[in-house]
């Protein structure tokens, strides 16, 4: 009886172990950590231009003026570690200075923000090993859609959350709304990663694989936020060593680990489909044997 249970457990864990080996092999072959480092570098260069473009879009729509402030606080509270207040102050100063630029400088900001979109596109298609290239006009349209619709959708989601908060006066809905608001950042991350893994690759991505990969990435991202904030508050070694400049290495490390999580979610999405194909091919060979 015990031997039968052990055999069943071994039989069930064998596919998981094979999938994990395939995942590790792909991470190694794709140089995932190097890709994450490249994206982190480009992201830091594009951070101020990207934020400037996003909030310039909100300024063009007066109805989003209040949502713009909420979105700004939401981003720095949920997508940056515990030093988000300091980083927010610096970035807002940089963005205020960028608003004084000429038309040529503004075009430069937009180009820099689009270069970040291109780098993300290139990295994800490297992971998917897709050789097919999009037409340049179509790529530009996709990047511009992300830059324009992304912030507007985020603003709409914040408007919904504000509406939910306004319903808290109803005692019967208090617990439900609190639970919804508590998992709202996780849901937003999950949807964002799912859209990223579904739209950006130039080959078709199975929807269920993108959902699983995005969910794992969203969970890791939420865990990273809490773990990073805990580390900074409990072990303030960066502040002791760097003083007022501590925000710089903290931001560097945060952005790098965030891109590692994003690319790991992409690797998981790809590996799910590849493992399924390899398993089907092996079963087909067994069926073909006399």
Swiss-Prot record:
<feature type="transmembrane region" description="Helical">
    <location>
        <begin position="183"/>
        <end position="203"/>
    </location>
</feature>
<comment type="similarity">
    <text>Belongs to the UPF0761 family.</text>
</comment>
<feature type="transmembrane region" description="Helical">
    <location>
        <begin position="140"/>
        <end position="160"/>
    </location>
</feature>
<feature type="transmembrane region" description="Helical">
    <location>
        <begin position="210"/>
        <end position="230"/>
    </location>
</feature>
<dbReference type="InterPro" id="IPR023679">
    <property type="entry name" value="UPF0761_bac"/>
</dbReference>
<keyword id="KW-1003">Cell membrane</keyword>
<keyword id="KW-0997">Cell inner membrane</keyword>
<dbReference type="GO" id="GO:0005886">
    <property type="term" value="C:plasma membrane"/>
</dbReference>
<feature type="transmembrane region" description="Helical">
    <location>
        <begin position="104"/>
        <end position="124"/>
    </location>
</feature>
<keyword id="KW-1133">Transmembrane helix</keyword>
<keyword id="KW-0472">Membrane</keyword>
<dbReference type="Pfam" id="PF03631">
    <property type="entry name" value="Virul_fac_BrkB"/>
</dbReference>
<feature type="transmembrane region" description="Helical">
    <location>
        <begin position="244"/>
        <end position="264"/>
    </location>
</feature>
<feature type="transmembrane region" description="Helical">
    <location>
        <begin position="44"/>
        <end position="64"/>
    </location>
</feature>
<keyword id="KW-0812">Transmembrane</keyword>
<protein>
    <recommendedName>
        <fullName>UPF0761 membrane protein YihY</fullName>
    </recommendedName>
</protein>
<dbReference type="InterPro" id="IPR017039">
    <property type="entry name" value="Virul_fac_BrkB"/>
</dbReference>
């Amino acid at each position: 009886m015990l031997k039968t249970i052990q055999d069943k457990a071994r039989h069930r864990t064998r596919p998981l172990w094979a999938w994990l080996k395939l995942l590790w092999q792909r991470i190694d072959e794709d140089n995932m950590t190097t890709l994450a480092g490249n994206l982190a570098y480009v992201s830091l260069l594009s951070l101020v231009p990207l934020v400037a473009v996003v909030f310039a879009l909100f300024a063009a729509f007066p109805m989003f003026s209040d949502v713009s402030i909420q979105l700004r606080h939401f981003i720095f509270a949920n997508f940056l570690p515990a030093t988000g207040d300091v980083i927010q102050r610096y970035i807002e100063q940089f963005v205020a200075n960028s608003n004084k630029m000429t038309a040529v400088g503004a075009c430069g900001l937009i180009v820099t923000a689009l270069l970040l979109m291109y780098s993300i596109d290139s990295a994800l298609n490297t992971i998917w090993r897709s050789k097919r290239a999009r037409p340049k006009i179509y790529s530009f349209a996709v990047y511009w859609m992300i830059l324009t619709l992304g912030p507007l959708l985020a603003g709409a989601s914040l408007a919904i959350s504000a509406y939910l908060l306004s319903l808290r006066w109803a005692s019967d809905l208090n617990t439900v709304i609190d639970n919804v608001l508590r998992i709202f950042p996780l849901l937003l991350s999950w949807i964002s990663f799912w859209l990223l893994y579904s739209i950006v690759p130039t080959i078709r991505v199975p929807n269920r694989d993108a959902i699983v990969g995005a969910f794992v990435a969203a969970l890791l991202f939420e865990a990273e936020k809490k773990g990073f904030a805990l580390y900074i508050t409990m072990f303030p070694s960066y502040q002791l060593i760097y003083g007022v400049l501590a925000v710089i290495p903290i931001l560097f490390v945060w952005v790098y680990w965030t891109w590692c999580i994003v690319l790991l979610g992409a690797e998981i999405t790809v590996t799910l489909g590849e493992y399924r194909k390899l398993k089907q091919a092996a079963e087909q060979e067994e069926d073909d044997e006399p």
